[in-house]
Amino acid sequence: MKPSIHSLAHQTMQEWVLEQGEKKFRADQIWEWLYRKRVQSFEEMTNLSKDLIAKLNDQFVVNPLKQRIVQESADGTVKYLFELPDGMLIETVLMRQHYGLSVCVTTQVDCNIGCTFCASDLIKKQRDLNNGEIVAQIMLVQKYFAERGQDERVSHIVVMGIGEPFDNYNNVLNFVCTINDDKGMAIGARHITVSTSGLAHKIRNFADEGVQVNLAVSLHAPNNELRSSIMKINRAFPIEKLFAAIEYYIETTNRRVTFEYIMLNEVNDSVEQALELAELLKNIKKLSYVNLIPYNPVSEHDQYSRSPKERVLAFYDTLKKKGGNCVVRQEYGTDIDAACGQLRSNTMKRDRQKAVAEVNP
C-alpha cells in the first residue's frame, strides 16, 4: 500500500526530490500543487517533468481516502464518512462558525479510552491514522467545496474526532506541523485545537514542544469517583495527576486550557457538581475555559440522556458566580448523525444488516 504524499513534511519532501536527482525547488512546486491548488492527481502538476510525475505515481498516492457518505445539516454542518485504503471507516465534520470554517478530524480507527457515553468507544482501537490520512480529510473537505463552485477555505482545525489524539502523538504532531506550515495550508497555530481525554504525560510532552496551538481537555466530571465510572482513562490518570500536568502546561506555555464537559442528565450536571468543578479550577481560573456540551444521545448508551435546559443553566450560573469562564456550546448538525462516531456506527450496522439479509434471503 503506497503512502499518501501528504505524509511528507516539507523538509522530507525536499530530501525526497534531491534523492530523485531533482532540484530542491521542486518540493516547493509539489507543495503548491497539493496545498494551494489542491490537485487530486500528480498528472495535474503541469510544471513537473513526466519522469518526476512517474516517480511520484510509483511511490505515493495523492489522497488515500474515498468518500463514502456525506450528510448535510440545515445549519450548514457537513458530516463525511471516509473509507481508508484497508476498508476501515472514519468520520470528519465541517462546522460553519461565525469566524470561519472549522473541520473536526479523526486520528484513530475506534478508541481505547473507554468513555461510556461515546459512540466512538463501541469497538476497541484497531489502528492509528498516519499523518497523511489525517491531512487528507481536510483536503477532501476542500475538494467537496471546489466541486460545488464554492470558494471557501478551511480556517480552523479541531483534533477532536474519533480516537485519542495523544495516543497517536507523533502522527498528530506531524499533522499539526504540516497544516501550520506557511508553504502548505498555512492554518494559524491559534486556529488549531488538539483535544485529549487526559493522558497526563503526553500533556507534559506537548507543553515542551513549543507549538502555539490550543489544548482542550475532555473532563466531563469534577471528581475521581464519577470520572472513573464514565471514563476509564481516569483510573490510569486520576484528576490529581491530570491537573498537575495541566498546571505544568499552563506554566510552561502561558496558554489557556479549554475543558470539555458533556452534560448528562442527573449524572454530572447538579449544582453541587458545578461547585466541585469551580473548586477544581480555582487555581487556574484565569487561564481556563469550560465548554458545557449538550449531549447527543447514542442508542447503544441509552443509560444517558440530555440534561434539560434548566439544569444546564443552573450549572452555568453556578460556575459563573464562582468566577469561572464558561459557555454553553452551540450545537451543530442536530438533524443528522451528529454525535462523534454515530454516522460510522450507524453505517456499520446497516452494512451488517445487508450482509445478514444476503446470507438469509
UniProtKB/Swiss-Prot annotation:
The active site is at 91 (proton acceptor), 340 (s-methylcysteine intermediate). Its EC number is 2.1.1.192. CDD domains: Radical_SAM. One of its GO terms (cellular component) is cytoplasm. InterPro entries: Aldolase_TIM (IPR013785), Methyltransferase_A (IPR040072), RlmN_N (IPR048641), RNA_MTrfase_RlmN (IPR027492), rRNA_lsu_MTrfase_RlmN/Cfr (IPR004383), rSAM (IPR007197). Disulfide bonds join 104-340. Binds 1 [4Fe-4S] cluster. The cluster is coordinated with 3 cysteines and an exchangeable S-adenosyl-L-methionine. Keywords: 4Fe-4S, Cytoplasm, Disulfide bond, Iron, Iron-sulfur, Metal-binding, Methyltransferase, rRNA processing, S-adenosyl-L-methionine, Transferase, tRNA processing. It is found in: Cytoplasm. This is Probable dual-specificity RNA methyltransferase RlmN. It comes from Streptococcus pneumoniae serotype 2 (strain D39 / NCTC 7466).
